[in-house]
Design a protein with these regions (language model features):
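Short hydrophobic alpha-helices and adjacent helix-cap/hinge residues
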Residues: 2-5, 23-179
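Bacterial N-terminal signal peptides that target proteins for export
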Residues: 1-14
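Bacterial N-terminal signal peptides
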Residues: 12-22
Length: 179
């Protein structure tokens, strides 16, 4: 019991420390990615055996491809401390249904036309869908929306989380805005 509390406090401290990290640049920032990765730690009912993180983009849109590449590079940043068990890969939106064993999906920039598909994928596969576009979560299409500029905001779509069967710890839910 004591170890669990220490783990939660450590995670909470790390998320709060992320607020002090400088911005990476581009549509999705390093800070957005750091916070998003730590959101995964607050999922209390994560399915076992899932270690993939799909960075979903639209290969037909240059800005989406560039943002996806920046997200992938930021996941390799030594300051991120990504768990060795989590493996990130770029996945074109047209190939998302073929991706398997995903723990989370990170949505690249310029994906608004695909929000319905992402929401349906999250519900069907019980996968956490993260976006740096807060409107994705506000619209109930992404599970979590994260923005770090001009100030940090984390929004959880209660509707999408429930439909996807995703539950978050109470400590996390106290730190975020739920829609």
């Amino acid at each position: 019991m004591g170890r669990a509390i220490i783990d939660r406090v450590t995670r909470l401290t790390f998320v709060l420390a992320c607020l002090l990290v400088p911005v990476w640049g581009g549509a999705t920032t390093l800070k957005d990615v750091k916070i998003g990765i730590h959101v995964i730690d607050f999922v209390t009912n994560a399915p076992s055996g899932r270690a993939g993180i799909a960075i979903v983009y639209d290969a037909r849109i240059k800005e989406s491809v560039e943002d996806a590449q920046l997200i992938l590079e930021s996941l390799s940043s030594p300051s991120l401390h990504l768990a060795a068990s989590l493996k990130a890969a770029l996945v074109d939106i047209r190939d998302l249904d073929e991706a398997s064993a995903l723990r989370a999906v990170i949505v690249a920039d310029r994906m608004k036309p695909h929000y319905d598909s992402l929401a349906e994928f999250g519900r069907r596969t019980r996968t956490l869908v993260l976006s740096s576009d807060l409107d994705c979560a506000r619209a109930g299409k992404c599970t979590v929306g994260i923005a770090s500029n001009p100030r940090v905001e984390v929004i959880v779509s209660s509707q999408q989380a429930q439909a996807s069967g995703i539950q978050f710890s109470e400590a996390f839910r106290m730190m975020v805005t739920e829609y």
